[in-house]
Design a protein with these regions (language model features):
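Active-site His/Glu-centered metal-binding helix of metallohydrolases
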Residues: 62, 66-70, 578
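Non-catalytic terminal extensions that flank enzyme cores
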Residues: 1-47
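Hydrophobic, small-residue-rich alpha-helical packing segments that form membrane-like cores
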Residues: 147-221, 225-243, 247-275, 280-282, ...
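Non-catalytic, conformational "gating/processing" segments within enzyme and secreted inhibitor domains
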Residues: 158, 210-242, 702, 723-758, ...
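M16 family metallopeptidases and their MPP-like homologs
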Residues: 45-55, 81-129, 136-147, 174-199, ...
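His/Glu-based metal-binding/catalytic segments typifying zinc-dependent metallopeptidases
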Residues: 40-42, 49-51, 162, 166, ...
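Extended, regular secondary-structure scaffolds
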Residues: 211, 223, 232-251, 374, ...
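Generic recognition of flexible, low-complexity loop/linker segments
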Residues: 94, 210-214, 273-276, 319, ...
Length: 974
């Protein structure tokens, strides 16, 4: 890039970013003062992000509602929902927007130059010239509205963000996290809920909503980021000529103010709702929260990440273990939150009681005091440093673009204009400094200053209360009814008309001319060749060695797998438990704490899991593998396999005290996952009514598993010996040479070494005779409704079309896009107010429809029933069909990290998917027409005919739906 050509910009700084093999530029737009960062490199996955400082002054969620709303049409793209059109018709590798406590971000990414330019154009127009000033309906749809269908009917609140936040506030873990921040920074913007508190969202007026945009969405308050291999001069010229130069400088008062330190640590007690069947005992959250430094100190930030690891995250970590030993809670964990101006460190005991608070605080201070006096465990700190350095060097963010993650990290410094904004991508020097500081008392001093002698903190107690959800629901109904009753006939008529007007706006189709404004690619811009499967079938001592020859920059990815088809149905939940036990208990040569630290000090980690593969050609067959996954530099491969062997061959399961700690922690975290990902929970359970594979997964990781672990935790004292015995039997049954196979991703230079090491592991496996079970799980349709203390629903319906003699086709991938962003989006999200709606179709015929954070239940099931007619009447032109095809391919052509390439190829192997199948399906997608979509109506009818329904939702909504559900029961019983 030639600096002489940047006439509209002033170059603030230029840096050689050696850690990420890039050149960094910091610019300032001369006319507006807009801040611009460029990171130039050879990464084809290009990223654009424009962010604004958006500090809220209340908890009405204005920043969040605006984030949704600006993407609902703009000056150059006057559609109702250009965001959806982009999702449907671009080759994006990322497309979203995010609201944080003090900023709002609009990032996009694509590997296609033309597509990237289109995405950038639409997003810039959206943030600077949104249609929110022309259509109040946008605010009412995305934020909140009074919903009154007839004068005598019930008055309700609706709105996408309103329902999203009802779901967020249904999780006590999320409530605790939000309240900690609010109470640590009560006099700043962090004392407000940027996402919106459902009880405050209806206080937001349309005018205040518009004023927020006028105030903060200006180039002078913007942070613009470009990353990757592109013509930076061209992009900067576009930015200036089309947008920035059309504005004058504005002095925007958006500086984030620091909270003045407290004179003394504060004590806060709050309540949260639990369902009627849930116990209040052992359900309290205790938290110890301290403000630590500021966002500009990148070394301190990484040091506190390491302290979180050394004190709380690692098994046997001293603070965690001390709190568990005194039974301060059934699960103990911590976090370091640094995405705001003043980061904070938190210690949480979950599954506690209010009367344990004093001991909770006392133990924390005693343990930390002892560490300051006697020194921190050097090995634990060194392991923590290596843990974070390995991940920093690896830079594997799965399907998320690397440049996107760098952008979000950089904003953590850049937004506050303190320190070097490039510091987050120049961390290697920080790791070197921390390694030296281990022996210099640095970590002990941080503990003393910030965690022990710091008055700026709070002790928060979150106490469960039965009936609180029903009480709040009743109060809201009474409030709305009182308001409805206060209105005159004319006002009621006007409200009904306004409800109808919003529905009319939502039901109106897009203007064809407006649709043509959205730039899009052609089918010819899409590569026709399907991705290659990188599998070489080798052997090690007659066992399968599946090799994936991928450039991994010196890191080897190992997956040792053991077939589990010999286990009995009643052993499946123990398999789910075993993956949480191995690696977290003592072995012959290490305590569990030493084991964890040794592994993390020398490798990228080892973890156990269960991988389940469905056969593409069968509705019944599947393969479940117990897996031990690890990654390390090639030079550390021998150590990695040594530790894997240690875990597999010498783990000690008889320590029932440790076993109980694991069971209690698993239960605690499973509760969060069940409700936090309620859509996945409901889909898996509904599929389990007829699918052997789904039934297996449910017993091993779903509701069935949670019911097992819940009872086990409750009755552990009586069942501890039995549990040890079952786990030992299970290990003997599956960790055997005849069950062994391995998948390895790495460069060929490392292959021979890994084969030898794998052979040694196999040779050490047990061979004593065991009894193999031929019994299989049975599936039973139950159509369950699971009651929670939450305020929203997750409504799933599943079925298998192959069981009706129908075949899979690539066109189903297009149907998924059509349903998720047309029919379901319009009927469940736009009209119904649900935050999300999804569908999916697998090669073995398993299919699902599901809603996410949905205020409805029966209405949603009725929407599902309408899908076949919608498909039969589906009308589209060539341009729209091409858009759906591009959107479908976008989801399939996501750039893959080296680890992902190996994992995807391994999955294809065990699922029986060939390159020929992938190419055939891709051709079916690229050549699809409206007629191909019409033919899929029969498939949806087959899915719906299975009548498999599962709902996770509020007590009241689930109870009301007893006529469409066969069983209604609580999700959580204790």
């Amino acid at each position: 890039m030639n600096k002489e050509n940047l006439t509209a910009y002033e170059v603030v700084t230029e840096e050689n970013l050696t850690d990420i093999h890039s050149t960094g530029w910091l610019l300032r737009h001369k006319k507006t003062g807009a801040r611009v960062m460029l990171i130039e490199n050879d990464d084809e996955n290009k990223v654009f992000n424009i962010a604004f400082r958006t500090p809220p002054k209340d908890s009405t969620g204005v920043a969040h509602i605006l984030e949704h709303s600006v993407l609902c049409g703009s000056r150059e793209f006057p559609l109702k929902d250009p965001f959806v059109e982009l999702v449907k018709g671009s080759l994006n590798t990322f497309l979203n927007a995010m609201t944080y406590p003090d900023k709002t971000c609009y990032p996009v990414a694509s590997c296609n130059d033309k597509d990237f330019q289109n995405l950038m154009h639409v997003y810039l127009d959206a943030v600077f010239y949104p249609n929110i000033y022309k259509r109040e309906e946008i605010f009412r749809q995305e934020g909140w509205n009074y919903h009154l269908e007839q004068k005598e009917g019930p008055l309700k609140y609706n709105g996408v963000v309103y329902n999203e936040m009802k779901g967020a506030f249904s999780s006590p873990d999320e409530v605790l996290e939000r309240e900690i921040m609010n109470h640590l920074f009560p006099d700043t913007t962090y004392g407000c809920e940027s996402g919106g508190d459902p009880k405050n969202i209806p206080d937001l007026t349309y005018e205040n909503f518009l004023n927020f945009h006028r105030t903060y969405y200006h180039p002078s308050n913007s942070y613009i980021y470009l990353y990757g291999n592109m013509d930076m001069e061209e992009k900067l010229a576009f930015l200036d000529e089309h947008y920035l130069s059309h504005f004058d400088y504005l002095d925007v008062d958006s500086v984030i103010q620091e909270q003045k330190a407290f004179g003394a640590c504060r004590d806060v007690t709050l309540e949260y709702p639990v369902a009627e069947n849930e116990g209040e005992e052992d359900n309290t959250y205790l938290s110890y929260n301290m403000v630590v430094g500021n966002a500009a100190d990148s070394q301190m930030a990484m040091a506190f990440e390491v302290l979180d690891y050394a004190l709380l995250s690692a098994p046997g970590a001293p603070l965690k273990q001390a709190l568990l030993d005194v039974k301060a809670g059934k699960d103990v964990y911590g976090s370091y939150d640094d995405g705001i101006l003043q980061p904070y460190f938190t210690v949480i005991a979950k599954g506690s009681n209010p009367d344990r608070k004093e001991e909770f605080v006392s133990v924390i201070r005693q343990v930390l005091g002892d560490i300051v006096k006697n020194g921190i465990d050097r090995k634990a700190v060194e392991a923590g440093i290596n843990y974070f350095e390995f991940r920093y060097r690896e830079a594997d963010f799965s399907s998320y673009p690397k440049g996107l993650m760098y952008s979000l990290d950089i904003l953590g410094d850049w937004l506050y204009e303190k320190g070097n904004p490039f510091a987050q991508v120049q961390q290697l020097t920080v790791f070197e400094k921390l390694k030296k500081a281990v022996n210099e008392g640095y970590f002990e001093e941080l503990i003393r200053k910030y965690l022990l002698e710091n008055p700026h903190g709070c002790i928060m107690t979150l106490v469960p209360k039965k009936g609180l959800a029903a009480q709040r629901e009743k109060e809201l109904e009474e409030k709305l009814e009182a308001y409805r009753s206060s209105l005159s006939e004319e006002q009621l008529d006007a409200m009904v008309e306004k409800t109808k007007a919003l529905e009319a706006y939502q039901e109106a189709g897009e203007d064809p001319k407006a649709l043509e404004c959205i730039p899009m690619l052609k089918r010819s811009d899409i590569k026709r060749e399907a991705a290659k499967i990188i599998n070489e079938e080798l052997t090690v001592d007659d066992s399968l060695f599946l090799y994936h020859d991928v450039c991994t920059n010196g890191i080897g990815y190992v997956d040792l797998m053991f077939k589990t088809d010999s286990i009995a149905p009643e052993q499946i939940p123990y398999l789910g438990l075993l993956k949480s036990v191995l690696g977290y208990v003592d072995t012959e040569n290490y305590t569990y704490g030493e084991l964890f630290n040794e592994i993390n000090a020398n490798t990228g980690g080892i973890n156990c899991g269960v991988e389940v593969f469905d056969r593409a050609d069968s509705t019944e067959e599947f393969q479940a593998m117990f897996s031990v996954r690890g990654k390390a530099l090639y030079t550390k491969m021998d150590f990695l396999f040594k530790m894997i062997g240690e875990i597999l061959n010498s783990s000690k399961l008889e320590d029932t005290k440790r076993l109980y700690e694991i069971v209690a922690s698993v239960k605690s975290r499973a509760q969060v996952n069940l409700t936090g990902a309620g859509h996945s929970t409901a889909v898996l359970r509904a599929a389990a009514y007829s699918s052997p594979m789904a039934a297996f997964q449910d017993e091993m990781a779903g509701i069935g598993y949670y019911q097992f672990i819940e009872k086990l935790e409750k009755d552990f004292e009586q069942r501890k010996e039995e549990t040890v015995e079952e786990l030992c039997k299970l290990m003997k049954k599956i960790l055997r040479p005849e069950n062994f196979m391995i998948s390895y991703t790495g460069e060929r230079e490392s292959l021979e070494t890994v084969q030898k090491l794998a052979g040694a592991v196999k040779a050490g496996l047990g061979t004593e005779p065991v009894e193999k079970s031929e019994e299989k799980l049975t599936c039973t349709k139950k159509n369950e409704g699971f009651k929670t203390s939450g305020q929203v629903q997750y409504v799933a319906q599943t079925g298998n079309f192959k069981k009706k003699g129908l075949e899979y086709t690539g066109a189903l991938e297009i149907l998924k896009v059509i349903l998720s962003y047309d029919y379901l989006w319009m009927n469940l999200r736009v009209k119904g107010g649900a935050y999300g709606c999804m569908s999916g179709f697998k090669r073995n015929g398993e299919s699902y429809l599901v809603s996410y954070r949905d205020p409805h239940l029966k209405r949603t099931l009725d929407v599902y029933k309408g899908i076949p007619d919608y498909i039969r009447n589906f009308q589209t032109d060539e341009r729209e069909m091409t858009k759906y095809i591009i959107g479908t391919i976008s989801g399939k052509d996501v750039p893959r990290t080296p680890q992902m390439k190996g994992s995807v190829s391994k999955t294809a192997y065990f699922c029986g998917v060939t390159e020929e199948m992938l190419q055939k399906e891709r051709d079916q997608i690229l050549n699809a027409s409206a007629e191909d979509i019409h033919a899929l109506a029969e498939i949806i009818e087959a899915v719906l005919a299975a009548d498999q329904i599962c709902v996770v939702g509020s007590e009241s909504k689930v109870a009301e739906a007893s006529d469409v559900l066969m069983e209604v029961k609580p999700l959580i019983n204790c």
